[in-house]
Amino acid sequence: MNKENKSKLEALLEKVANERDLEICGLNIQTNQNPVVIEITIRKTNGDDISLDDCALFNTPASDEIEKSNLLNCSYVLEISSQGVSDELTSERDFKTFKGFPVNVELNQKNSKIKILNGLLYEKSKDYLAINIKGKIKKIPFDEVLKISLCTLKD
């Protein structure tokens, strides 16, 4: 599939997604497979979780539009999935959802080394992140934080 047809297919699928308050966050076309595999990752525009029903409700109109477009002149498999949960916490929703969960916090040190703190996510404000490390709350200014990730708690 050439770039022009891939762009047309992507625009077509985005239109179908937008009509259902969804957005495409990933599109992978595996033309080396027989049949061709089209993997589409979707999420809801309002941030709600994607259900299996949402994937199924997107599948039929997406498939219909692909057929009508004649962009593919071969058989294909359409796979619709949700974005899933990322290990890295970035959105306000992530911080609310995973409050109390174990996290690794990567800190930027003045000597350009990275320090990792491990604890339970306690609180996030606009200025700092608070984690519970063995019963003590540590407030970390956001300008020191490089990355916050879910993890398994270490002793």
UniProtKB/Swiss-Prot annotation:
Keyword terms: Cytoplasm, Ribosome biogenesis
Main localization (coarse): cytoplasm
Gene3D superfamilies linked to this entry: RimP-like superfamily, N-terminal (3.30.300.70)
GO biological process, one term: ribosomal small subunit assembly
GO CC list: cytosol
The organism's place on the tree of life at top rank: Bacteria
Family annotation (SUPFAM superfamilies): YhbC-like, C-terminal domain, YhbC-like, N-terminal domain
InterPro entries: Ribosome_maturation_RimP (IPR003728), RimP_C_sf (IPR036847), RimP_N (IPR028989), RimP_N_sf (IPR035956)
Subcellular locations according to the entry: Cytoplasm
Function noted in UniProt: Required for maturation of 30S ribosomal subunits.
NCBIfam families in the record: PRK14646.1 (NF011240)
Family: Belongs to the RimP family.
Protein name: Ribosome maturation factor RimP
Origin species: Prochlorococcus marinus (strain AS9601)
Lineage: Bacteria, Bacillati, Cyanobacteriota, Cyanophyceae, Synechococcales
Gene: rimP
